[in-house]
């Protein structure tokens, strides 16, 4: 039977064409794809034990609830996956909801939002006893012990308990329950260590205030994630380097490149932008609270930044100042003219120890580091990176304000016990782009990647070279699309002949 061409056939052809076009490879897409994230959590009976004693103000308790919600968001919640219970405590213990109560993430999050503080004393031992003997029991929804099901308790507290936690914690650990202890503010750190499982550096966390407790959420999201290495399996879209983390990955670039805003592709870094000069000075806290092993990680962090700079007399210069109770200039701007020499000097830097005089160090930066006599160049962008792990023992506000008033681009990097208010005082505007915090020295390399993007200014998108590159890219995409359309047209012609 002969089928003639007509409106119906034209409509059919158009639909076929659209279906085939939908199969055009993703590589032709002009829209950046999001960074990879895939996480499956192993089946877990998880109980939060949350201190809401009178020392925890209502606004601070709200921040705890945000932290809890962020951790829950990352879990596979369900009767056969992760079950979550919550125990609220002060002088008494109040079970907010048992493990069996909520089979979905949405209902769990609603239950967390409804929790109110109790506002009396601090009976942490009593709360732990309840969590272990009641909250994880069969009657409350706890499952039978099995190698396939984890039993986890996370304690959040900000004070010294009015009872003992040692014995009950030992019994819990002996029975196979994994204990995490999170301390806030003036918490008794010895108590945290008595509660937590080994290794303690993975099970004890401390933050200066409730304002930064949310920053711990990522750690717990990764702790519960058991998905395979996405970089090793090739399930990523990074142009150069893939850096794996549990259930996720981030893209990185080779030495001399910086990551673009799409989080996947890389550009050559030119120190303060193509053809511009940057004077960059690191102001590094070498106080005793840092500890020698962490100071070595700080040195690696510095060299990670140096690796991305185009070091030369015309472009990027680097200086380094270490401070504690006193200030020591390790090397001024312009002393070293190659990355290799700068990195060697950083590796050879010795650890000062003693106190934390951040205010005096900032004043030194202003009065000495960015002067012509110390190698600074008139007209060059002035960038200061302040790295600290604790509260300053002197006043920082005046010096921090003056540095920004002079036009210095100031970045503040805090680790562990660093005080958020001080970091924000140091950071340039917008503060969100110039202030960085992590709870653990082991993760400062992630801050390094973010800093690289801020220091390395993108070239002018309207510059002639950029326009030519864009035009060439678009032309290539159009040619590829044209070839695809020609192939589709050929297939349609063959199909039409067969039908006829």
UniProtKB/Swiss-Prot annotation:
GO annotation, biological process: chondrocyte differentiation; extracellular matrix organization; growth plate cartilage chondrocyte morphogenesis; regulation of bone mineralization
Phenotype of null mutants: Knockout mice are phenotypically normal with the overall length and shape of skeletons and skeleton components at birth comparable with wild types. Histology of proximal tibial growth plates of 15 dpc embryos and mice at birth show no morphological differences. Collagen fibrils in the collagen matrix surrounding zone of maturation chondrocytes and zone of hypertrophy show an abnormal unidirectional organization and also contain sporadic larger diameter fibrils at both 15 dpc and at birth. No change in deposition of Acan or type X collagen matrix in the proximal tibial growth plates at 15 dpc.
Pfam families reported for this sequence: FXa_inhibition, Matrilin_ccoil, VWA
Keywords: Coiled coil, Disulfide bond, EGF-like domain, Extracellular matrix, Glycoprotein, Repeat, Secreted, Signal
Domain EGF-like: 227-267
UniProt domain VWFA: residue ranges: 30-226, 268-457
Signal peptide boundaries: 1-29
Coiled coil residues, start to end: 471-499
Database matches in PROSITE patterns: EGF_2, VWFA
Tissue: Expressed in femoral head articular cartilage. Expressed in the trachea and extraskeletal tissue around the eye.
Disulfide bridges in this chain: 231-242, 238-251, 253-266
Matches recorded under Gene3D superfamilies: 1.20.5.30, Laminin, von Willebrand factor, type A domain
GO CC terms: extracellular matrix; extracellular region; matrilin complex
GO molecular-function terms, A-Z: calcium ion binding
Description of post-translational modifications: N-glycosylated; reduces binding affinity for type 2 collagens.
UniProt subunit comment: Homotrimer. Part of a complex composed of MATN1 (via VWFA1 domain), type 2 collagens and type 6 collagens. Forms a complex (via covalent bonds) with ACAN; the interaction increases in abundance with increasing age of the organism via an increase in occupancy of MATN1 binding sites. Interacts with COMP.
Protein name: Matrilin-1
